[in-house]
Amino acid sequence: KVSQLEDDLTTSEAKNTKAASRSGGLAKQLADAEHKLGLATKNIKSLEGALSDAKSAAEDESKGKHDNHQKLQNALSEIEALTEQLDEEQASRQDLQNKFSRANADAQQWKNKYDTDGASRVEELEDAKRKLANRVQEMEEALAAAESKAASMEKVKNRMNEEVEDLLLDLEKAQAQASNLEKKQKKVDQQINEWKLKCDEIQADLDKAQRDARGYSTELLKVRTASEDTIEKYDALKKENRALSAELQSVTEQLSDGGKNSAEVEKLRRKLGMENEELQIALEEAEAALEQEEGKLLKVQLEYTQLRQSSDRKLSEKDEELEGLRKNHQRQMESLQNTIDSESRSKAEQQKLRKKYDADMMELESQLESSNRVAAESQKQMKKLQAQIKELQSMIDDESRGRDDMRDSASRSERRANDLAVQLDEARVALEQAERARKLAENEKSENSDRVAELQALYNNVANAKAEGDYHSLQEEIEDLENEAKASEDKAQRAMAEVARLMSELNSAQEATSTAEKSRQLVSKQVADLQSRLEDAEAQGGKGLKNQLRKLEQRIMELESDVDTEARKGADAIKAARKSEKKVKELAFTIEDEHKRREPAQDTADKLNQKLKKMRMQLEEAEQQKSTWQSKYKKAAVELEDAEERCEAAEAALQKARQRARGASGSATRGASRAPSQPRTPRSKTARAGED
């Protein structure tokens, strides 16, 4: 049995070493998880930097919008200047009409004068009429050009006014969208603050529950230790009771063997009976205390389970609240995604219109190749507008490059967020593995504790059996000595048996705690009395009996040393089991702390993902606004090119009119050369020329 007990102890020590190695592995896994969490915090800081960069880029974009607004104001001022120029053109047109009316009056005067002066001044009149016709034709051409130019300028003015109105409407829409986005941002910030407060409350409740659980666990350990002490005291008292009952039986046997010293034996029996009653009372008190401690232990366990259930219930409720908030936020994100899709469809339609406008521009460029010159004033204005368009195009290109940079930064931040999510998943998996390992370690710890308890019980049983076997062997030796000795040595043999029993009682009293010290002192006094009696009996007996008693005492000392070594081994095994239990509990607390640290990191990662999505949406809206501005600027450029083409067409019409006027003047000169031979025909021709 002792060898089996030693084997069990070795197996328990091996299991304890395995548990220690597993706890070391779990500690390594926790260290890896801490390292991963450190990397996650670094990545979160980098994401925060990227978010700050994106915010700065958004501020730059708002500055660009402000600059575009200023440019719009400048374009409006230029439109006002063009309107003033149009008014001047209308005034010049009025002057030309006045000159034309004056020329008609002069022609009428010349006609009247020609009618009065007669044929003598036909040639002069013809020359004056030709000059006047040329002048009238030039005036008409200039007037037509001015009218066409005024009409084109009026159309340009109307178009520019319409564009300005469209731009103002778009600006108002953009401002309304910006205000809506700011309101949404404020609402989201309020929700985030509310979530933070709720998370802080949940964390405070969880910390409080864990502190209470730790306090209850410490009280539970104290109650367990107290119960173990009471159990040990109870076992010690049982051993003492057994020893006293054995002593009482031996005394009764002595009384049955002989009637000598009956008075002393009767006193001793009464004394032992009183001591037995006292020990029985102490045993009952110990049992009552043990029952009280067990009741306290059950009460503490019930309170601990109730507290654990309440904390789990609160955590589940908080998790449900967070899940509901997360679903609401997901719905908002889906609605925003739908709006983004509609805006992307409108953007595709704008791309189609842009392609159509590009085709129209190609056709207009083919028409521009056939034109020759542009009027000076319109050319200057066109150059100014082209310079402005180039500046706007360069600004748009800069904004597009900034947009590409922002898109790249957003993509980088998204990749970082994905990497963070992967790392968080890995950390979560590692924590789950650590949790499973912790549970396995706890199961092994409970199995080891049960095994140690069983081994302790086996050890106690084996020790008791060994002590009883040694006791029986000693009794057999004493009986052999009784058979060899004479009747005069009976008292000495009984005293030796009493010494052996009292020595076994002393060994059991050494294993008990300080509460059993009083009973051991009483037993030691009894041993002293019996030793004095034994010395008296030895004085009466022979020297051979003394040698045998010495041998028996040496054997008793050896047995005591063996029992002490076995007790030390058992105590060491119990200490090792308690140390492993403490290590497992510390590991469980560290895993719970890591779980607490991981939850705020997950929350911050989710918040950063939400902020990234918002920034991405804002970037897409800014891109759409830029595309609308760019399309409007291109439309203005197309309209300006149309105006330029109309100016060129007017100039070509002017040249054609001049050519027709030159042809008409040539025919008039040929009619004048035929005038002397036929005096009346020239008049009719000149009249027709005037009508023409």
Swiss-Prot record:
GO terms for molecular function: actin binding; ATP binding. InterPro entries: Myosin_tail, XRCC4-like_C. Residues 1-692 are annotated as: Rodlike tail. The keyword Cell cycle does not apply. Residues 662-675 have a biased composition (Low complexity). Residues 1-27, 48-71, 307-422, 506-529, 644-692 are annotated as: Disordered. Residues 1-10 have a biased composition (Acidic residues). Keywords: Actin-binding, ATP-binding, Coiled coil, Cytoplasm, Motor protein, Muscle protein, Myosin, Nucleotide-binding, Thick filament. Residues 56-70, 342-359, 398-418 have a biased composition (Basic and acidic residues). Residues 25-670 form a coiled coil. It is found in: Cytoplasm, Myofibril. The keyword Nucleotide-binding applies. GO terms for cellular component: bicellular tight junction; myofibril; myosin complex; myosin filament. Pfam families: Myosin_tail_1. Residues 11-20, 506-524 have a biased composition (Polar residues). PANTHER family: CINGULIN-LIKE PROTEIN 1-RELATED (PTHR46349), MYOSIN-6-LIKE (PTHR46349:SF6). Myosin is a protein that binds to F-actin and has ATPase activity that is activated by F-actin. This is Myosin heavy chain. It comes from Podocoryna carnea.
